[in-house]
Amino acid sequence: MSLTKEQILDAISNMSVMDIVRLTSMMEEKFGVSTASLTTVEPDTSEAIVEEQTEFNVFLTAIGNNKIPVIKTVRSITGLGLKEAKELVESAPVILKESINKDDAETLKKTLETVGASVEIK
């Protein structure tokens, strides 16, 4: 018995944010891809067009020694509950925020680094 696309979509829509994050990570690992680095291939043109990146993803790469302050900060940033924030922090490296502007990404990075977390912006 195979599942239809609609059944898969229904199952995903009933998952928690943490489960979706884990599912995404599992899919990246299984298929050898990264959702953070998906790009489209465009034909080569004679003129090089340089586009400035306007949207950034904030990655929590490590929590450091101060786990509780990091969890509290992640809770305030993401709006997650305590349990979900704790699970998210413990599953580092993980994406905390996606498609945000550069200023917000830098602010989040500084805030998290202040409490001892290691953060990357991509």
Curated annotation (Swiss-Prot):
It comes from the Bacteria. InterPro entries: Ribosomal_bL12 (IPR000206), Ribosomal_bL12_C (IPR013823), Ribosomal_bL12_C/ClpS-like (IPR014719), Ribosomal_bL12_oligo (IPR008932), Ribosomal_bL12_oligo_N_sf (IPR036235). One of its GO terms (biological process) is translation. GO terms for molecular function: mRNA binding; structural constituent of ribosome. Keywords: Ribonucleoprotein, Ribosomal protein. One of its GO terms (cellular component) is cytosolic large ribosomal subunit. Homodimer. Part of the ribosomal stalk of the 50S ribosomal subunit. Forms a multimeric L10(L12)X complex, where L10 forms an elongated spine to which 2 to 4 L12 dimers bind in a sequential fashion. Binds GTP-bound translation factors. PANTHER family: 39S RIBOSOMAL PROTEIN L12, LARGE RIBOSOMAL SUBUNIT PROTEIN BL12M. NCBIfam families: L12. This is Large ribosomal subunit protein bL12. It comes from Blochmanniella pennsylvanica (strain BPEN).
